[in-house]
Amino acid sequence: EGMSLDSFLVVNNGNYFKQVMIPVVDEKYFKNDMIVLFYNYATLPSSMYPNDRSNVDNWNIDFVYFDKNRSYNDITYPLITFSEKSPSLLKRYQSMPYRQYKSNPTVAMSTNYRMYFINLDSAGANVQYSCKIENTTNGWSYDYEADWSTVSPYANHGIHEYPVHFNNFLFDMDDKLDMATYQITHIVNVDENSSSAKGDTIVGLQVFNDYYAYDDGTPERGYGVVPDDSYFASQFTISVPDTLCGVQLLFNRTHNDANYDFFDIVVWNDNNGKPGNEVYRLKNQRPIWD
C-alpha cells in the first residue's frame, strides 16, 4: 500500500532541480523499518514514426529527506554536494584501450575538466575541492588540491561550476599490462568556521581495457535511423594498428516491437573525418532484448 504522488506530475520547465514537499501524516508510516520505494509510470508519445513510441520519460530522485515538525518553508539542508558524476579525464573518450593510451598518452589526456557543486544550505560557505587518483593494481597515486572558494546557496546562485586544471598530468603506465583501472575520489570539504554544512565525496573509475566508449553506457537518450537506407557513424581514432572484434549496442524496445528491423553493421575507413570506403559489412542483424 502506498501514496499517489501527483506532485511529481508538475512540469519542471527545464529546471536542473525541483524540490517536492510531501506531507506524511498517516500513522501507519511512522515505523523505524519503513522502506521508501518509488515507481514511475511512463507515457507513450504520439509520433509519426512508430519506432519513436518508447519509454522516453526519464526522471531521477536526488535524495529523500524526512524530519518531524517541518513546514513548506523548510526547504534548505546543511549539505554542499556534487551535482554531477565523476568526469572522464580523457579528452575524447570515457574509456579506451590501454595499448592505445600508452602509445600516445599526451594526446589522449584532457588538460582540464569541470566539477559541479550545489549548496543546499541557506547561507554561503567556504569550500575546497580535492581529488585522489589511485591505480587499483599497483598503488600508484596522485593528489590534487584546489584553492578555497565561496559557494552561495542554490536558491541564489544555482549550480556552481568549478574548472579543474591539471598541468602535464598522465596516468602511470606499465608496458607489461594490457589493462588498468584508476579509482578517482572527488571531495568537497567545508570550512567549519564558515558553515556547519557537510561536504560530499563521489568516486569514479577510469578504465583502460580493450574497448573504446564515448560514455559510461547509461541509456540517457536514444534516436532512430529513418527513413530506410539511412545510416549513422561513430568515429574512433587509433594511435597504433589494432583489430576490431565487436561492437556493443543498446536498442530501446518500442511499442509493439516497431523497431524490430533488420540493420547492417558497417566499418568504413576514414575520409577527412567522414566515412570513406567500406571495409566490412555484417548484414541482416536484428535487436535482441533481454
Segments (PLM) and residue ranges:
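Beta-sandwich/jellyroll recognition modules and their flexible linkers
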Residues: 1-116, 121-127
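Short, well-structured beta-strand segments enriched in hydrophobic/aromatic residues
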Residues: 30-40, 175-187, 247, 290
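Conserved aromatic beta-strand anchor motif in extracellular beta-sandwich/beta-rich domains
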Residues: 1, 131-135, 265-269
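Activation corresponds to long, low-complexity, non-globular regions
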Residues: 70-207
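Short strand-edge motifs at loop-to-beta-strand transitions and within beta-strands
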Residues: 18-22, 160-162, 232-234
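Short coil-to-beta strand junction motifs in C2/discoidin
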Residues: 58-59, 124-129, 256-265
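Beta-sheet-rich sandwich/jelly-roll-like modules and their strand-loop junctions
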Residues: 185-273
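Aromatic- and Gly/Pro-enriched, solvent-exposed loop/edge beta-strand patches characteristic
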Residues: 9-15, 257-290
